[in-house]
Amino acid sequence: EIMPSLVGSEMCIRDSHIALPEYNQAASSESAILYGIRKEKACAPQLNSGLFAAMKEMGDVRGVFVGHDHDDDYAVSWKGILLAYGRYTGGNTVYNHLTNGARVIELDENANSFRTWIRLKEGVVQQVTYPADFIKE
Protein backbone atom coordinates (compact mmCIF):
# COMPACT_ATOMS: atom_id res chain seq x y z
CA GLU A 1 0.00 0.00 0.00
CA ILE A 2 1.36 3.35 -0.96
CA MET A 3 -1.04 5.87 0.59
CA PRO A 4 -3.29 4.19 3.19
CA SER A 5 -3.36 7.13 5.59
CA LEU A 6 -3.80 9.77 2.90
CA VAL A 7 -7.28 8.94 1.62
CA GLY A 8 -9.48 11.97 2.01
CA SER A 9 -6.65 14.45 2.58
CA GLU A 10 -5.65 17.22 0.21
CA MET A 11 -3.26 16.22 -2.56
CA CYS A 12 -0.12 18.34 -2.89
CA ILE A 13 2.83 18.24 -5.23
CA ARG A 14 6.16 20.01 -4.84
CA ASP A 15 8.28 21.60 -7.53
CA SER A 16 11.97 22.37 -7.08
CA HIS A 17 15.09 22.71 -9.19
CA ILE A 18 17.53 20.53 -7.22
CA ALA A 19 16.76 16.89 -6.40
CA LEU A 20 16.60 15.68 -2.80
CA PRO A 21 19.13 13.08 -1.58
CA GLU A 22 16.28 10.55 -1.58
CA TYR A 23 16.30 10.58 -5.40
CA ASN A 24 19.59 8.66 -5.35
CA GLN A 25 18.33 6.25 -2.69
CA ALA A 26 15.14 5.54 -4.62
CA ALA A 27 16.73 5.23 -8.07
CA SER A 28 19.38 2.80 -6.83
CA SER A 29 17.01 0.63 -4.81
CA GLU A 30 16.62 -2.88 -6.22
CA SER A 31 12.97 -2.92 -5.18
CA ALA A 32 12.08 0.37 -6.88
CA ILE A 33 9.87 0.63 -9.95
CA LEU A 34 11.49 3.27 -12.15
CA TYR A 35 10.11 4.61 -15.44
CA GLY A 36 12.21 6.75 -17.73
CA ILE A 37 15.85 7.57 -18.27
CA ARG A 38 18.57 7.78 -15.63
CA LYS A 39 21.90 8.63 -17.25
CA GLU A 40 23.44 10.34 -14.25
CA LYS A 41 23.31 10.33 -10.47
CA ALA A 42 21.19 13.11 -8.99
CA CYS A 43 23.26 16.17 -8.07
CA ALA A 44 21.57 16.31 -4.68
CA PRO A 45 23.02 18.04 -1.62
CA GLN A 46 25.35 15.93 0.51
CA LEU A 47 23.64 17.23 3.63
CA ASN A 48 20.13 15.85 4.03
CA SER A 49 17.98 18.70 5.37
CA GLY A 50 15.11 16.41 6.36
CA LEU A 51 12.73 17.98 3.83
CA PHE A 52 11.61 14.59 2.46
CA ALA A 53 10.97 13.30 6.00
CA ALA A 54 8.94 16.43 6.76
CA MET A 55 6.84 15.99 3.60
CA LYS A 56 6.27 12.35 4.49
CA GLU A 57 5.20 13.36 8.00
CA MET A 58 2.78 15.98 6.65
CA GLY A 59 1.09 13.21 4.67
CA ASP A 60 -0.29 15.30 1.81
CA VAL A 61 2.62 15.47 -0.65
CA ARG A 62 2.14 12.92 -3.44
CA GLY A 63 4.91 13.98 -5.81
CA VAL A 64 8.13 15.97 -6.03
CA PHE A 65 9.23 17.23 -9.46
CA VAL A 66 12.72 18.55 -10.16
CA GLY A 67 15.11 19.46 -12.98
CA HIS A 68 18.81 20.39 -12.89
CA ASP A 69 20.18 17.03 -14.07
CA HIS A 70 19.57 17.32 -17.82
CA ASP A 71 20.17 13.65 -18.62
CA ASP A 72 17.48 12.33 -16.27
CA ASP A 73 13.72 12.23 -16.81
CA TYR A 74 12.72 9.27 -14.63
CA ALA A 75 9.91 8.81 -12.14
CA VAL A 76 10.28 6.51 -9.12
CA SER A 77 8.17 5.97 -6.02
CA TRP A 78 9.92 6.27 -2.66
CA LYS A 79 8.14 5.73 0.65
CA GLY A 80 4.79 6.80 -0.75
CA ILE A 81 5.92 9.87 -2.70
CA LEU A 82 6.66 9.99 -6.43
CA LEU A 83 10.08 11.47 -7.17
CA ALA A 84 10.27 12.61 -10.79
CA TYR A 85 12.40 14.67 -13.13
CA GLY A 86 11.10 16.98 -15.79
CA ARG A 87 12.75 17.11 -19.20
CA TYR A 88 15.18 19.73 -20.46
CA THR A 89 13.06 22.20 -22.44
CA GLY A 90 15.70 24.03 -24.46
CA GLY A 91 18.12 26.91 -24.54
CA ASN A 92 21.85 27.09 -23.97
CA THR A 93 23.30 24.55 -21.55
CA VAL A 94 26.56 22.88 -20.65
CA TYR A 95 25.21 19.47 -21.62
CA ASN A 96 22.04 17.72 -22.73
CA HIS A 97 21.80 14.29 -24.32
CA LEU A 98 18.02 13.94 -24.35
CA THR A 99 15.56 15.38 -26.85
CA ASN A 100 13.99 18.60 -25.57
CA GLY A 101 10.58 18.17 -24.02
CA ALA A 102 8.54 18.78 -20.88
CA ARG A 103 6.92 16.81 -18.06
CA VAL A 104 3.14 17.22 -17.85
CA ILE A 105 1.22 16.53 -14.63
CA GLU A 106 -2.54 15.94 -14.62
CA LEU A 107 -4.10 15.85 -11.14
CA ASP A 108 -7.22 13.84 -10.34
CA GLU A 109 -8.26 14.98 -6.88
CA ASN A 110 -11.35 12.75 -6.88
CA ALA A 111 -9.20 9.65 -7.33
CA ASN A 112 -6.38 10.88 -5.06
CA SER A 113 -3.96 10.18 -7.91
CA PHE A 114 -2.31 11.85 -10.87
CA ARG A 115 -0.96 11.05 -14.32
CA THR A 116 2.34 12.31 -15.58
CA TRP A 117 4.23 11.99 -18.83
CA ILE A 118 7.01 13.43 -20.92
CA ARG A 119 5.80 15.44 -23.90
CA LEU A 120 8.15 15.58 -26.87
CA LYS A 121 7.70 17.29 -30.23
CA GLU A 122 7.01 13.81 -31.65
CA GLY A 123 4.40 12.93 -29.01
CA VAL A 124 3.96 11.52 -25.53
CA VAL A 125 6.34 9.07 -23.83
CA GLN A 126 6.56 7.50 -20.38
CA GLN A 127 2.95 8.02 -19.35
CA VAL A 128 2.31 6.72 -15.82
CA THR A 129 -0.43 6.98 -13.22
CA TYR A 130 0.56 7.42 -9.60
CA PRO A 131 0.22 5.42 -7.44
CA ALA A 132 -1.30 2.63 -9.59
CA ASP A 133 1.71 2.03 -11.87
CA PHE A 134 4.10 1.84 -8.91
CA ILE A 135 2.39 -0.91 -6.92
CA LYS A 136 4.13 -4.26 -7.07
CA GLU A 137 1.86 -7.24 -7.59
Regions found by a protein language model. Give the residues of each.
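Single conserved hydrophobic/aromatic residue that forms the stacking wall/gate
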Residues: 1-8, 12-13
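Hydrophobic/aromatic beta-strand patches that form the interior of the parallel beta-sheet core
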Residues: 13, 63-65, 84
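A cross-domain feature marking catalytic cores of carbohydrate-active enzymes
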Residues: 16-18, 118
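Active-site environment of divalent metal-dependent phosphoester hydrolases
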Residues: 18-24, 61-77, 91-93
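Flexible internal linker/loop segments at domain or repeat junctions
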Residues: 21-50
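N-terminal short leaders/motifs
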Residues: 37-39, 55-63, 67
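Short amphipathic alpha-helix initiation/capping segments at coil-to-helix junctions
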Residues: 44-45, 67, 94-98
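Binuclear metal-dependent phosphoesterase catalytic core
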Residues: 50-58, 72-137
